[in-house]
């Protein structure tokens, strides 16, 4: 199980700058979600994705603060990992996962991880390097998006996973140079035993500086919940938010 945070902005900024004083509250979640952290920046200009991943807790990392402060971009994703049992703690299993101008982060589990492998296009299957369910989720999404387009492709990927796999949560964020897609798709009853009822909730906050989406568990005054079984699509040119039933 993991924590997700992402933003898009009309201006180049950083996570500490756009989130503000409460960013430290989000980072503190790495006391539990301590198996790694990862950052990707996805500029709308189409410049290459910058990817940083470490197998350590963000709050205890000697490089985390400097990395999130210096990576300035108009779009970025941040992931705090709490590894699913049976999935190794390694840099290759640390999110985000990237392909072309797409970057992806996931919170939840798909059992067994390989159950969706037959539905992944061979060109993407050849890119899989570890045993992570999340990596397979990403490449299934890429397979379907290439065939059907962004929203229809994502819906198709979710349908395949739900038909063939056993899942706790498929919450995720996918970003490219044109769009920022956040998915809230989870089984509340399958949260960790210790976690509050809102553990899987995703919330968002439009501001003059951009749009933020994040997992729960930290101070989020004024944020709006993204309803379960829905996705939010942000157009990175207009910053309009479209909420879609999935």
Where are these regions (language model features)?
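Long, charge-dense
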Residues: 117-142
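Catalytic core of PPM/PP2C metal-dependent serine/threonine phosphatase domains
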Residues: 75, 150-186
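A conserved acidic, glycine/proline-rich C-terminal tail/linker
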Residues: 192-230
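Short acidic (Asp/Glu) patches
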Residues: 55-66, 79-100, 120-123, 217
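Conserved beta-strand-loop-short alpha-helix elements that form
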Residues: 2, 102-112
């Amino acid at each position: 199980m993991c924590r997700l945070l992402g933003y898009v902005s009309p201006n180049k900024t950083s996570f500490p700058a756009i989130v503000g004083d409460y960013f430290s509250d989000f980072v503190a979640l790495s006391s539990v979600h301590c198996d790694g952290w990862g950052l990707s920046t996805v500029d709308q200009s189409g410049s290459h994705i910058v990817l940083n991943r470490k197998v350590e807790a963000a709050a205890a990392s000697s490089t985390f603060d400097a990395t999130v402060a210096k990576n300035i971009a108009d779009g970025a994703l941040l992931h705090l990992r709490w590894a699913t049992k049976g999935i190794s703690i390694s840099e290759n299993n640390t999110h985000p996962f990237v392909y072309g101008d797409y970057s992806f982060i996931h919170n939840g589990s798909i059992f067994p991880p390989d159950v969706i492998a037959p539905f992944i296009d061979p060109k993407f299957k050849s890119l899989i390097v570890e045993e992570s369910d999340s990596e397979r989720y990403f490449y299934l999404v890429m397979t379907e998006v290439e065939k059907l387009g962004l929203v229809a492709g994502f819906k198709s990927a979710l349908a395949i996973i739900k038909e063939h796999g056993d899942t706790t949560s498929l919450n995720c964020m996918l970003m490219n140079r044109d769009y920022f897609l956040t998915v809230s798709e989870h089984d509340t009853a399958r949260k960790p035993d210790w976690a509050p009822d809102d553990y899987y909730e995703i919330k968002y906050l439009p501001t003059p500086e951009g749009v933020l989406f994040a997992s729960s568990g930290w101070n989020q005054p004024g944020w709006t919940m993204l309803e379960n079984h829905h996705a939010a699509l942000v157009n990175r040119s207009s910053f309009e938010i479209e909420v879609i039933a999935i």
